[in-house]
Curated annotation (Swiss-Prot):
Subunit structure: Interacts with LGALS1 and laminin.
Job of this protein: Binds to extracellular matrix proteins. Binds to pathogen-associated molecular patterns (PAMPs) present on the cell walls of Gram-positive and Gram-negative bacteria and fungi, behaving as a pattern recognition receptor (PRR). Induces bacterial and fungal aggregation and subsequent inhibition of PAMP-induced cytokine release. Does not possess intrinsic bactericidal activity. May play a role in the innate defense and homeostasis of certain epithelial surfaces.
The SRCR domain, residue ranges: 20-120, 198-298, 304-404, 467-568, 772-872
Protein name (Swiss-Prot/TrEMBL): Soluble scavenger receptor cysteine-rich domain-containing protein SSC5D
A single Gene Ontology CC term: extracellular matrix
Segments for region (Disordered): 153-192, 412-465, 614-769, 895-1475, 1554-1573
Source organism of the structure: Homo sapiens (Human)
Keywords, sorted A to Z: Cytoplasm, Developmental protein, Disulfide bond, Glycoprotein, Immunity, Innate immunity, Receptor, Repeat, Secreted, Signal
Glycosylation sites: N168, N376, N420
GO terms of molecular function: extracellular matrix binding; fibronectin binding; laminin binding; scavenger receptor activity
The keyword Chaperone is assigned to this record: no
S-S bridge residues: C45-C109, C58-C119, C89-C99, C223-C287, C236-C297, C267-C277, C329-C393, C342-C403, C373-C383, C492-C557, C505-C567, C537-C547, C797-C861, C810-C871, C841-C851
Bias kind Basic and acidic residues: ranges: 672-685, 924-934
Tissue expression as described in the entry: Highly expressed in monocytes/macrophages and T-lymphocytes. Highly expressed in placenta and spleen, and also detected at lower levels in colon, and more weakly in lung, heart and kidney.
C-alpha cells in the first residue's frame, strides 16, 4: 500500500507539474516559469535552478532545448505562491514533476527569485502532420548566412521585434539577415523634412535603389541624363554606403513620383555632396520618371552574426574583422555585452549571455576579448575591449548570445495556453479552463491537456488568389507562398525572373514588380513543402497557376532558395514610399509582442476621425488571454504620442491598446475569413492584422505633426476605415485636441527640423504637469525612468517596483508593453532628485501619477537603485521608427538627433536644458567623435514628444517649454552631437600654447641673424628699444629664453629658439641670429650691478657688432651702434654699450661682465639683444680672434681690464651687465665666467667656446661686437693683442662664425674658455665687436670637448655656454691663434670654421651654421655703444672663475681669442688695436690688458690641453677595457662550444657502449642536446 500511495502521490505531482506556462516573456518559449498546482498558478524559486532544470521545462513545453535559465525574476516577479524550490533535474527527465525538489510550497524564497526559461523555440512536431514547421530543426533562416563585407546585407531579415527598438531589425547593419529590401528604405524615406538630402527607395537593400533628393519641401528624383559612376560615387559616399557599383538609369528601380529635381548631373567624383556637382537648375529637366536614376552601392559590411544557434537571434557571436569572421572570448562577457550585440543585430534585448562555447566552438581568429559594455551602446564596436585580435582565450571560451527577438518570419512555437482571460497575477486565483487558444505572449497551459493544441491552417478564401506574400514588410512584399493540397508551400527560385514576379504581383493586385530580382531567401526560409519549381511565365498570364512549371512538389531545391517578391503596391492606392516599414501589432500573430509586416500601412483615409474606445476589449487574434479590465477604467486619460510629419509615409498604423486581449479564440477565427490569408498559421504572415481583427476596437485619430495633447483618447492609432469591421466599436468624436507645437522657422536653431513625433505623456494633476521620460536608452521606449516634478527631472527608486508599475509607465509613454528588464540599473544611475519611491500601481492606471507612492522626494534610495525600463514598442505607427539612417554619420540616428548629410544644421531636437541641470547623459551613436561616446545627447520627452537634451524639461503647454534646439543653460555642458550633425559647432580643440622659450637661453633664439646682422640697422638694433628688451627685466624674464628672440623683431625666430647655435654661425654674424632676441630674455634682472663699462676701445669692429645685433633678441637686430643704446635702455644697457665702455672692462666690473658669462645672463642673453652690448663690454673677448671666443672674450673684455676678475665676476657681473641687457647675458654666462676656468679648458677645443661669448655680445651689441671683448679672449689665443680681436671682428664677418665651427679650431680660444662666459657672451659677442673678432660671438664653447661653455646663460643662443657641447666655434681666425691648436682636440675645434659657424649657435644642440652675412660685421659697429656694457659683461673675468669652478665641459675654453682670421679675417686687418668702423674705444688696444688677457688665455689653453690629454687617456683605457671584455666574451663562447662538443662526444660514447635503452624517453634523449656549460 505504501508503494501504491507513493506512486499515487508521484502521479499527482506529475499531473500537477505537467501544467506549465511561461509568462511575461517576449514569446511563447521564453518567460517566467509558472506551475499550476492546487488550483492556482505559482512560480518556481531559482534556488538550484540551472540549465538542466530549464531543459526539462522547455522539453515539456514543446519548445525545444533550453538556451538559458535566468533567475532573479529576470522576466519580472510573479504572483501567487512559490510552488517549487531547489529543483534538481538531471536534464533527461520527461517532465518537471519527475525531478527531485524540496516539496510543494517548501521554500525560503520571494518572488524576487522567480525562475525563468529561455527555450530554443523549436517545437516538437506533434502538433501537425508534417515536421516542416519553421520551428522544426534547422537553425533559423539566414542567421548563419556568411556574408562578407562585400556582399549585400543578409537576405533574411531579423524579426523586427518589440525589443526596445522595434526598428532595430530594420536599422541594424549587422551581417545578420536584414529586413528584406526595405529595412533601410523606410529609414531613408521617413522624415523627409529631415536633413537627409538623399535617399534610396525601392531597392533590394538600403544601399541600392532609386535615388531621390529632398528639395523645396518635397522628395524628387534625378534624371539619368549624363548619370554615370562618378555621380553615383558621390551619392553613395554622401549616403554612407561606400563606393558605387553601378549607376543604372531608365527607372531601373521603378519610376518615382514628384518633381524631377536634378538633371545633367556632372560630378567629378570627388565632391562631398551631390548638390555640389555641376547640374541643371533645380527642377529644370527634359525628363520624365521613366528616366529616373538609380544607385547600387557597395554598402556597409556586416559586422556581427550569431552562428550555430536555433535561430538567427541566438547563437555563437561572431564578428567580421580583417576580412574574416572571428569569435568573441567570454572573459568578462555578460548580459550588458549581449544586450548591445542583440540590439545591433536587430534582435531586441538579451535574454542570456552564455559563455564556454555554449553554441559550439568557432573557428578562425578570436577577434575580441574583455568586452566591457555598459549596455546602452549602439554597437559592440563602441564598447571598451582589448585591441582587435588580442586575447588570452581558446575557442572553448567562445561567447554566445540569446536575444529575445526572432528573425523575420519566425513564429515562436506556442506552448499550450490557458484560455481564461487572466493575467498571471489574476490567474492565480482562477483555475484554468479547458478552452485553449494560441497566445503569442505568455503562453498559458491548459491544465488537462499536456500537449499543445493543434490548430488548422487557414487557406485563402474561395475566389481569392491561391498565393500570398509573407514575412515581408507589407502584403505586397515578402516570401511567395502558394496554397495547394490544403497547405501553404513555397516556390523555388530556379528560373525565376521578373516576368514571373509580374504575374504574381498582378494576381495579388499589387501592381508590378518593384525590384529587378530579389535574391532567394531574402524574406527568410519558408517551411512546409516546396510546391513549385522551374516556373516559366511569359509575363502576360493572369495567374501563376497558368504558367508552365515542374509538377507540384517536384523540385531540387531547399528553403534557402525560396522566392521573394516585392511589388509596387495596389494600383488603386498611392504607393507607399517606404513600403518596408514594420508595424508593431501587439495583439496580432502568435507572438503577442511580435513585429508584423506593416501591411497596415495603408494610406489613411481622409475621413479618419479621432475616436475613443467605448469598449476596451480588443479582439486581437492569437493574443494570449489577458484581462482587459485593467485598461478599461482610465482609457480616456491615456496620453497619446503624436506621429511625426512624414511626407513620405502614406500609410498609418492600426493598433489596439497594448494590453487589450482577445476575448475568445473563436471570435478571432470567425472574423478572419474575410480575406484570403492564413492569419492563424503558426508563423506570422504579412496579412494585415485588421483583416482578422474584426472585433478589434481601435481609436482613430488624424496624425498631425508635432501634435501635443494632454488629454487624449486611450490610444491614438490610425487605421484605414475600410479595414474596420462593423463589429468594431468606434465612436466618432471631435478631433482630439491636437495642436502643432509652436511654429518656428525650420531653419532656426530652435526649430525641430525633424518631423519626429512629439508624443505627449503629460497629465495635469493637482501637483501640476506630470511628465515621464526614459533617458540614456537606445530609443525613447527604453531607458532610465525619469519624472518631471517641481521644475526638475528626477528618477524613480526601484523599491517595490514590479511589472505592474512598469506596465503603467510603458502605457503612459505610449510604448506598448513591458519587456523583461535587464538589471535594475541597466541604464545607469541618474542625477538629480529621486522623486518617487515605493510605487504601488495595480496595472490598470493610465498614468504613474494615479498610482499610490511615497511623498514626492521622500525615499531611502540612492541612484544605484534608479528604475530602468524597457518597453516593447510604439503605439503609433507614425512615430515609428524613431531611428533614421544618417548618411553623414553612416549610422542610424534617433529622429531629430541629427540631420542626415546636411552640413551646417543644428540638431533638430536640441533643446535647452534647465540651467544648472546636469549635462544630459549622452549616448554616442556610431562614428561620433564625441568623447562621451556612449550617450545620446537627448532623451525622449513624452510630453513634448520629441528628443530633448537631457536635463531639459519638455516644452509642454503646462510646463516649461523647450523649443527644439533652444540653447542650453549657460552652465550646462553642451550636448554631444552625433557624427552626422554638422549643425552645431564643434568643440574647438584646446588651444595649444606655444612653448615658452627657456628663460636662460639667450643667444640661440636669435637665429634671426639676418635682421640683426643686417648692417643697416646696427644702431637700431641696439636702440633703446632693444635695450628695453635687454633690460635685465626683459632679459631676465624667462622669456629671455628664445622668447625674446627676435633680435630685430621682439620675438625670436622659432628657429632661433631651437637653434641657438645659429647665432654664432659666423664670427661676425655670430649674434645676428634671433638669439640676440633671446639675449634680452637672458638679461637677468637680478644682475643689478652694471658691469663696469669696458674701455670703449674694447668695442670691436662695427662689423662685428652688426653681427651681434642680429644676435640681440630685442635686436632690434641692428644692434650695432644702436645696440649700445639698447643696452643702455636696459639697466645694463650701458653695459651693452660697453663696447663703448671698453674702458670699463678693465675695472673689475668687467669681470662682473664675466659673470655675464651669459650663464646667468643666459637668460639675459636671451633678453639681450641688448645683451649683445653686454658683450660689447666683453668686446675684447670679442676681439678675441674667435668671434666665438669673442663671446666669451666679450665677457673677457673685463679680462682686458682684468680678465681674471671678471672671470670671477662672471656670474654676478653678468647679472649686473644685464643692466645693459647684455649683462643678463653675463648672468647666464656665470658658468661661463669660469670660462677661464679649467672647465673651458676641457672645452679647450672649444675655443669656439670663446666664440660663444662672442655670440652673447653679438646679440646685444651686435655692433659692440663684443669683439672688443673677444679680443680680450683673443689675445689670449694668439692675438695677444686684443687687437687680434679686432681683426677678429674683421674676421668677425663671423662668417667665420659661421664657420664658427671653424672657430672650433680656435682652440686658442680654448684658453678663452675663460670666455666660457662666452656662452653668455655669445649672444653679445657675436654681435659685439665683430671687428675685434666679433666672430668670437660664435659660441665655441661646445668646441674642443664638445662641451658647452658656461655661457649657456645665453640660453637661447648662448646656450652652448651652458652646455660645453655647444661648441661655439670661433672663426678660423681664432684658429690662427697659437692656442687654437691646443683647442683643436676639442670637438668644437673639430668643426671646421664653417662648422664653427654651426657651433656658433652657442647651443651645442644646434649646430647649424647660422652664417650671417659678414657684412653684418659692419653693422656691429654700432655696438660700440654697447661696448661699455658688453665690455664689462663680457669681462673674461669669468675665465678665471671658470677654470676653478666650472666644469671644463660646461665651459669649454674659448679659443685663445682665436682672433686668427677664422672667418677669413686676419687678425692683422684691423691690427690688435684697430677700432671698429664706427669708432669704438677698444680696450683691447691697451697693452697691459692684452698681456693679461693673453696670459690668461694661454693658461686656460694649457689647462684645456691637459684636460684633453686626460680625456684621451681615459678613452684609451675604455677601449682597452672594451677589448678585454670582447675577448672574454669570445672565450666564454668558445667554452660553450667546447662544452657542446664534449657532450656530443660523451653521448656518442654512451650510445656505442650501451644499446640505446628502450625506456629512454624523447625528453631524456634531448636533454644532452640542451646541456649547459
Amino acid at each position: 500500500m505504501r508503494v501504491l500511495a507513493c506512486l499515487l502521490a508521484a502521479l499527482v505531482g506529475i499531473q500537477a507539474v505537467e501544467r506549465l506556462r511561461l509568462a511575461d516573456g517576449p514569446h511563447g518559449c521564453a518567460g517566467r516559469l509558472e506551475v499550476w498546482h492546487g488550483g492556482r498558478w505559482g512560480t518556481v524559486c531559482d534556488d538550484g535552478w540551472d540549465l538542466r532544470d530549464a531543459a526539462v521545462a522547455c522539453r515539456q513545453l514543446g519548445c525545444g532545448g533550453a538556451l538559458a535559465a535566468p533567475g532573479g525574476a529576470f522576466f519580472g516577479e510573479g504572483a501567487g505562491p512559490v510552488w517549487l524550490s531547489e529543483l534538481a533535474c538531471r536534464g533527461n527527465e520527461g517532465q518537471l514533476g519527475l525531478c527531485h525538489h524540496r516539496g510543494w510550497k517548501a521554500h525560503i524564497c520571494s518572488h524576487e527569485e522567480d525562475a525563468g526559461v529561455v527555450c530554443a523555440g523549436q517545437r516538437v512536431a506533434n502538433s501537425r502532420d508534417d515536421s516542416t514547421s519553421p520551428l522544426d530543426g534547422a537553425p533559423w533562416p539566414g542567421l548563419l548566412l556568411e556574408l562578407s563585407p562585400s556582399t549585400e546585407e543578409p537576405l533574411v531579415t531579423h524579426a523586427p521585434r518589440p525589443a526596445g527598438n522595434p526598428q532595430n531589425a530594420s536599422r541594424k547593419k549587422s551581417p545578420r539577415p536584414k529586413q528584406a529590401k526595405s529595412t533601410r528604405a523606410p529609414l531613408l524615406t521617413t522624415g523627409a523634412p529631415r536633413q537627409e538630402r538623399l535617399r534610396l527607395v525601392s531597392g533590394p537593400h538600403r544601399c541600392a535603389g532609386r535615388l531621390e533628393v529632398w528639395h523645396g519641401g518635397r522628395w524628387g528624383t534625378v534624371c539619368d541624363d549624363g548619370w554615370d559612376l562618378r555621380d553615383a560615387a558621390v551619392a553613395c559616399r554622401e549616403l554612407g554606403c561606400g563606393g558605387a557599383l553601378a549607376a543604372p538609369g531608365g527607372a531601373r528601380f521603378g519610376p518615382g513620383a514628384g518633381p524631377v529635381w536634378m538633371d545633367d548631373v556632372g560630378c567629378g567624383g570627388g565632391e562631398q555632396a551631390l548638390r555640389d556637382c555641376p547640374r541643371s537648375p533645380w527642377g529644370r529637366s527634359n525628363c520624365d520618371h521613366s528616366e529616373d536614376a538609380g544607385l547600387v552601392c557597395t554598402g556597409p559590411a556586416p559586422r556581427l552574426r550569431l552562428a550555430d544557434g536555433p535561430h538567427g537571434c541566438a547563437g555563437r557571436l561572431e564578428v567580421w574583422h580583417g576580412g574574416r569572421w572571428g569569435s568573441v572570448c567570454d572573459d568578462a562577457w555578460d548580459l550588458r555585452d549581449a544586450a548591445v550585440a542583440c540590439r545591433e543585430l536587430g534582435c531586441g534585448g538579451a535574454l542570456a549571455a552564455p559563455g564556454g562555447a555554449f553554441f559550439g566552438e568557432g573557428s578562425g581568429p578570436i577577434i575580441l576579448d574583455d568586452l566591457r559594455c555598459r549596455g546602452n551602446e549602439t554597437a559592440l564596436r563602441f564598447c571598451p575591449a582589448r585591441p582587435w585580435g588580442q586575447h588570452d582565450c581558446h575557442h572553448r571560451e567562445d561567447a554566445g548570445a540569446v536575444c529575445d527577438g526572432m528573425p523575420l518570419g519566425y513564429v515562436p512555437p506556442t506552448a499550450p495556453t490557458d484560455s481564461n482571460n487572466s493575467t498571471p497575477r489574476e490567474a492565480a486565483s482562477r483555475p484554468p479552463s479547458t478552452m485553449t487558444s494560441q497566445a503569442p505572449g505568455t503562453a498559458g497551459v491548459s491544465p488537462p491537456p499536456a500537449s499543445p493544441t493543434v490548430l488548422w491552417e487557414p487557406g485563402p478564401e474561395a475566389g481569392s488568389p491561391q498565393l500570398r506574400l509573407v514575412a515581408g514588410p507589407s502584403k505586397c512584399s515578402g516570401r511567395l507562398e502558394v496554397w495547394h493540397d490544403q497547405r501553404w508551400g513555397t516556390v523555388c527560385d530556379d528560373s525565376w525572373d521578373m516576368r514571373d514576379s509580374a504575374v504574381v504581383c498582378r494576381e495579388l493586385g499589387c501592381g508590378g514588380p518593384q525590384q529587378p530580382d530579389p535574391a532567394a531567401g531574402r524574406f527568410g526560409w519558408g517551411a512546409g513543402p516546396i510546391w513549385l519549381d522551374d516556373v516559366g511565365c511569359v509575363g502576360t498570364e493572369a495567374s501563376l497557376s497558368d504558367c508552365p512549371a515542374a509538377p507540384w512538389g517536384k523540385h531540387n531545391c531547399a528553403h534557402n532558395e525560396d522566392v521573394g517578391v516585392t511589388c509596387t503596391g495596389p494600383p488603386g492606392l498611392d504607393s507607399i514610399s517606404d513600403p518596408f516599414s514594420w508595424s508593431w501589432i501587439p495583439g496580432l500573430g502568435r507572438d503577442r509582442d511580435a513585429w508584423l509586416p506593416g501591411e497596415l500601412a495603408t494610406k489613411p483615409s481622409a475621413s479618419v476621425t479621432a475616436s475613443v474606445l467605448e469598449k476596451t476589449t480588443t479582439k486581437a487574434p492569437g493574443k494570449m488571454p489577458k484581462s482587459t479590465k485593467k485598461w478599461v477604467t482610465k482609457n480616456a486619460k491615456r496620453p497619446t504620442t503624436q506621429p511625426p510629419v512624414m511626407p513620405t509615409t502614406k500609410h498609418s498604423r492600426a493598433q489596439s491598446p497594448p494590453d487589450l486581449t482577445s476575448q475568445t479564440t473563436a471570435a478571432l477565427t470567425t472574423e478572419a475569413s474575410r480575406r484570403p490569408t492564413s492569419e492563424f498559421t503558426r508563423r506570422p504572415t504579412t496579412e494585415a492584422p485588421q483583416r482578422w481583427t474584426s472585433h478589434t476596437t481601435a481609436t482613430l485619430t488624424p496624425q498631425a505633426p508635432r501634435e501635443r495633447t494632454t488629454k487624449t483618447m486611450a490610444m491614438l492609432t490610425t487605421q484605414g476605415p475600410q479595414e474596420m469591421t462593423s463589429e468594431s466599436t468606434i465612436k466618432s468624436i471631435p478631433q482630439a485636441s491636437l495642436e502643432p507645437s509652436a511654429e518656428i522657422p525650420e531653419g532656426s536653431p530652435e526649430s525641430p527640423k525633424d518631423p519626429a513625433p512629439s508624443p505627449s505623456v503629460s497629465t495635469t494633476g493637482e501637483s501640476g504637469l506630470f511628465r515621464v521620460r526614459l533617458a540614456d536608452g537606445p530609443n525613447r521606449c527604453a531607458g532610465r525612468l525619469e519624472v518631471w516634478h517641481a521644475g526638475r527631472w528626477g528618477t524613480v527608486c526601484d523599491d517595490n517596483w514590479d511589472l505592474r508599475d512598469a506596465t503603467v509607465a510603458c502605457w503612459e509613454l505610449g510604448c506598448g508593453k513591458v519587456r523583461p528588464r535587464v538589471g535594475k540599473t541597466h541604464y545607469g544611475p541618474g542625477t538629480g532628485p529621486i522623486w518617487l519611491d515605493d510605487m504601488g500601481c495595480k496595472g490598470s492606471e493610465a498614468s504613474l501619477s494615479d498610482c499610490p507612492s511615497g511623498a514626492w522626494g521622500k525615499h531611502n534610495c540612492d541612484h544605484e537603485e534608479d528604475v530602468g525600463l524597457t518597453c516593447t514598442g510604439y503605439t503609433d505607427y507614425d512615430d515609428y521608427p524613431p531611428w533614421t539612417w544618417d548618411p553623414t554619420s553612416r549610422e542610424d540616428l534617433a529622429k531629430g538627433t541629427t540631420t542626415a548629410g546636411v552640413p551646417g544644421h543644428t540638431l533638430p531636437w536640441r533643446t535647452t536644458r534647465r540651467p544648472g541641470s546636469s549635462s544630459p547623459a549622452i549616448r554616442r551613436l556610431p562614428d561620433t567623435g564625441s568623447k562621451d561616446g556612449y550617450k545620446l545627447p537627448w532623451t525622449w520627452d513624452t510630453p513634448s514628444g520629441r528628443g530633448l537634451a537631457e536635463g531639459t524639461p519638455t516644452a509642454g503647454k503646462l510646463g516649461p517649454t523647450l523649443g527644439a534646439g533652444t540653447t542650453r543653460s549657460p552652465g550646462s555642458p553642451p550636448t554631444l552631437r552625433v557624427h552626422g550633425d554638422t549643425g552645431s559647432p564643434r568643440k574647438p580643440w584646446p588651444e595649444r600654447r606655444p612653448p615658452r622659450p627657456a628663460a636662460t637661453r639667450t643667444a640661440p633664439p636669435t637665429p634671426s641673424p639676418g635682421p640683426s646682422a643686417s648692417p643697416g640697422p646696427p644702431g637700431p638694433a641696439l636702440t633703446s628699444d632693444s635695450s628695453r628688451e635687454l633690460t635685465p627685466h626683459s632679459a631676465l624674464t624667462s622669456e629671455a629664453t628664445s622668447d625674446a628672440p627676435d633680435t630685430s623683431p621682439p620675438t625670436p625666430d622659432p628657429a632661433s629658439r631651437t637653434n641657438p647655435d645659429l647665432i654664432l654661425t659666423s664670427p661676425d654674424f655670430a649674434l645676428s641670429t634671433p638669439d640676440s632676441s633671446v639675449v634680452p630674455a637672458l638679461t637677468p634682472e637680478p644682475s643689478p650691478t652694471p658691469l663696469p663699462t669696458l674701455p670703449k676701445e674694447l668695442t670691436s669692429d662695427p662689423s662685428t657688432p652688426s653681427e651681434v645685433t642680429s644676435l640681440s633678441p630685442t635686436s632690434e637686430q641692428v644692434p650695432e651702434s644702436d645696440t649700445t643704446p639698447d643696452l643702455d635702455t636696459t639697466p645694463y644697457s650701458s653695459t651693452v654699450s660697453e663696447y663703448s665702455r671698453s674702458p670699463d672692462p678693465s675695472p673689475s666690473p668687467h669681470p662682473t661682465t664675466t659673470p655675464d658669462p651669459t650663464m646667468a645672463p643666459d637668460p639675459i642673453t636671451t633678453l639681450n639683444p641688448t645683451v649683445t652690448p653686454h658683450f660689447p663690454t666683453t668686446p675684447h673677448p670679442t676681439t678675441t680672434p674667435h668671434p666665438t671666443t669673442i663671446t666669451h672674450s666679450t665677457m673677457i673684455p673685463d679680462p682686458t681690464t682684468t680678465p681674471q676678475p671678471f672671470t670671477t665676476i662672471t656670474h654676478s657681473t653678468m647679472i649686473p651687465d644685464p643692466t645693459t641687457t647684455p649683462q643678463p647675458f653675463t648672468t647666464m654666462q656665470p658658468t661661463t665666467t669660469p670660462h677661464s676656468t679649467t672647465p673651458h679648458p676641457t672645452t679647450t677645443p672649444h675655443p669656439t667656446t670663446i666664440t660663444h661669448s662672442t655670440m652673447i655680445p653679438d646679440p646685444t651689441t651686435t655692433p659692440q661686437p663684443f669683439t672688443t671683448m673677444q679680443p680680450t679672449t683673443m689675445p689670449h689665443p694668439t692675438t695677444t693683442p686684443h687687437p687680434t680681436t679686432t681683426p677678429h671682428p674683421t674676421t668677425t664677418p663671423h662668417p667665420t662664425t659661421t664657420p664658427h665651427p671653424t672657430m672650433t679650431p680656435d682652440p686658442t680660444t680654448t684658453p678663452y674658455p675663460t670666455t666660457t662666459p662666452d656662452p653668455t657672451t655669445t649672444p653679445h659677442p657675436t654681435t659685439p665687436d665683430p671687428s675685434s673678432t666679433p666672430v668670437i660671438t660664435t659660441v665655441s664653447l661646445p668646441t674642443s670637448l664638445g662641451t658647452e661653455l658656461s655661457s649657456p646663460t645665453l640660453a637661447p643662443t648662448v646656450k652652448p655656454s651652458l652646455h660645453p657641447q655647444l661648441t661655439f666655434t670661433a672663426p678660423a681666425p681664432h684658429t690662427s691663434t697659437s692656442q687654437i691648436p691646443t683647442l683643436e682636440p676639442s670637438p668644437a675645434l673639430e668643426s671646421s670654421p664653417s662648422r664653427s659657424s654651426t657651433a656658433t649657435s652657442m647651443d651645442p644642440l644646434s649646430t647649424e651654421d647660422f652664417k650671417p652675412p659678414r657684412s653684418q660685421s659692419p653693422n656691429l659697429t654700432p655696438p660700440p655703444t654697447h661696448t661699455p656694457h658688453s665690455a664689462s659683461d663680457l669681462t673674461v673675468s669669468p675665465d678665471p672663475l671658470l677654470s676653478p669652478t666650472a666644469h671644463p665641459l660646461d665651459h669649454p675654453p674659448l679659443d685663445p681669442l682665436t682672433l686668427g682670421p677664422t672667418p677669413g679675417q686676419s687678425p692683422g686687418p684691423h691690427g690688435p688695436c684697430v677700432a671698429p668702423t664706427p669708432p669704438v674705444r677698444v680696450m683691447a688696444c691697451e697693452p697691459p690688458a692684452l698681456v693679461e688677457l693673453v696670459a690668461a688665455v694661454r693658461d686656460v689653453g694649457g689647462q684645456l690641453q691637459r684636460l684633453t690629454q686626460v680625456v684621451e687617456q681615459e678613452r684609451q683605457e675604455r677601449q682597452a677595457l672594451l677589448l678585454g671584455l670582447t675577448q672574454l666574451v669570445e672565450a666564454a663562447r668558445g667554452l660553450g662550444q667546447l662544452g657542446e662538443a664534449v657532450k656530443r662526444l660523451a653521448e656518442m660514447a654512451w650510445t656505442t657502449s650501451m644499446p640505446a635503452p628502450t625506456t629512454t624517453t624523447p625528453e631524456e634523449e634531448e636533454r644532452p642536446l640542451r646541456g649547459d656549460v
